[in-house]
Structure formats: structure tokens, C-alpha cells
From Swiss-Prot:
One example GO MF annotation: RNA binding
This protein's name: Transcription antitermination protein NusB
UniProt-listed InterPro entries: NusB-like_sf, NusB_fam, NusB_RsmB_TIM44
Annotated SUPFAM superfamilies: NusB-like
Gene assigned in the entry: nusB
Function comment: Involved in transcription antitermination. Required for transcription of ribosomal RNA (rRNA) genes. Binds specifically to the boxA antiterminator sequence of the ribosomal RNA (rrn) operons.
Keywords: RNA-binding, Transcription, Transcription antitermination, Transcription regulation
Domain of life assignment: Bacteria
């Protein structure tokens, strides 16, 4: 499902950067062009869950990021990093991935390697790992 996470990250980033509405979360990115079957309900549902869930829980997600990222305000964070973090926090906190929470973090790191800056991976790993440890305690 890495490809679906990449598309969801791109949509989350696009909505944030363009300050656009979420009227149709499938409007900007043609999932079929990415080799994914949009008619597959599990793919469509997972994508929708990531995008809608992230924005529906944005206040809580941002609060968690602020609590963990000590000296970083959300305004100072790179928008790519913030989009990856928001989606990662949503997945860890609200989706049922009991056996694969580490995989959520690994996926976020892979996305950061491709789309983020040279320090994005460490930054994102640190915050998501701290959140996971807090959740386990």
C-alpha cells in the first residue's frame, strides 16, 4: 500500500499548499495512471481514509506533533515534512495497524527520502518514533 500512501501524501500536501478544498479527493491525482485500480474498493477506501482522516482529525494531529516536536512550531516546519507527519500521525493514532505500526513509520521515511530534504528522514523518524513510544507507554 506504499503507492497509495504516496498519493495520499501528495493530496494532503497539495491541499495544504494550495489552501484548496477537499471537495473531490480524487480530482487532482489520477490513481489509475499510477498503476492502481481505483475500482478496487480496498485501495479507494484506504486512500480516502488517509486523506479524509488526516483532515478530519487535523487539530488533534497538529496538537500531537506540537507536543512531540518541542522547539519546532508547525509554521517553521517544511510543508513536505508536515504533510508526511500528519499522515503518519493519523495512521499511528487512528488507523488499526496494531501489527505494523513500525511499517507506517518506515513508509513515512521512504516518502521523506523521495520528497523531503536531506534531514527530513531523521526529523520524521524522530517524531513518529516518539509518538509510537508514547502510545506504547
Amino acid at each position: 500500500m506504499h503507492e497509495v500512501r504516496v498519493l495520499a501524501f501528495q493530496k494532503i500536501y497539495s491541499i495544504d499548499i494550495n489552501q484548496s478544498a477537499m471537495d473531490d479527493i480524487f480530482d487532482i491525482f489520477n490513481i489509475e495512471d499510477k498503476g492502481l485500480d481505483i475500482e478496487n474498493e480496498s485501495i479507494k477506501s484506504f486512500y480516502s481514509s488517509l486523506v479524509n482522516g488526516t483532515f478530519n482529525n487535523l487539530e488533534h494531529i497538529d496538537s500531537l506533533i506540537r507536543d512531540i516536536s518541542w522547539n519546532w512550531s508547525l509554521d517553521r516546519m517544511d510543508k513536505v515534512d508536515l504533510a508526511i507527519l500528519r499522515m503518519g500521525v493519523y495512521s499511528l493514532k487512528f488507523q488499526n495497524f496494531e501489527n505494523s505500526k513500525r511499517a507506517v513509520i518506515d513508509d513515512a521515511i521512504l516518502i521523506a527520502k523521495k520528497y523531503g530534504s536531506k534531514n527530513s528522514c531523521k526529523f520524521i523518524n524522530g517524531i513518529l518514533d516518539a509518538l509510537l513510544k508514547n502510545m506504547e507507554n
